[in-house]
Amino acid sequence: MHVIEVLGPGCANCQRLEANTRSAVDMTGAQAQIVKVTDYAKISSYGIMSTPGLVIDGEVVSFGRVPSSTDIAEWLRQMDLAAAQAG
């Protein structure tokens, strides 16, 4: 199961990122827990200078923009493939 964190204070872009993330999870059928992170200390611990940010399984995959649901779905597929190959 993936842990996906949407980082940001709850602004319009943060809400769009969360919606795109939920759509990507639905598109891929991935098992995922989506967590909204609004605590600035936690956000800054990832080294993110601008929000929104997206973290999948502890890895920052995007910040400062709103990636499309298609982009997010591709990142999820790549992570699943890498995990399967690592066995």
Region locations from a protein language model:
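Structural micro-motif
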Residues: 47-55
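Local sequence-structure signature of Cys/Sec-based thiol-disulfide redox active-site neighborhoods
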Residues: 1-25
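Glycine-rich phosphate-binding loops of nucleotide-dependent enzymes
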Residues: 85-87
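Non-catalytic, surface beta->alpha helical segment in thiol-disulfide oxidoreductase systems
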Residues: 56-83
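Thiol-based oxidoreductase modules, predominantly thioredoxin-like and allied folds used
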Residues: 30-42
